[in-house]
Amino acid sequence: IELTASTATVAEAAQALGVQPGMIAKTMSFLQGDQAVLILTEGTAKVDNRKYKDTFHTKAKMIPFEDVERLIGHAPGGVCPFGVPDEVEIYLDESLRQFETVYPAAGNDHSAVKLTLSELEQAANAKGWVDVCREIETPV
């Protein structure tokens, strides 16, 4: 989906697509030593540092803004799990499972793609599912 409106942030993407923010599959970029790792989460989810360390046996360290495009192949605002270097490891967070379809970015800050979770898992060539996000608090 190519859009005239920006999809660089979860809020912008949700508004441009007319969906709830959680349906935006947010792609977060981490470094584990020299290894670039992408984790796709539900749009409003936040990474829980303890869960991340328990899962990956290292502290959560985001890739510095200025290094994202060089290491991932996409600039911030358009980072997605498609068309990345083969050595980049990709994981899907359990927070996504509450939705049947999600909208990850598609390589730039004016794009998205609608996928079912199984389509996303296959298209992203994900190594697997992880649980590294905080529990999402439901408003009362």
Spans of features found by a protein language model:
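Extended, low-hydrophobicity, polar/charged segments
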Residues: 1-140
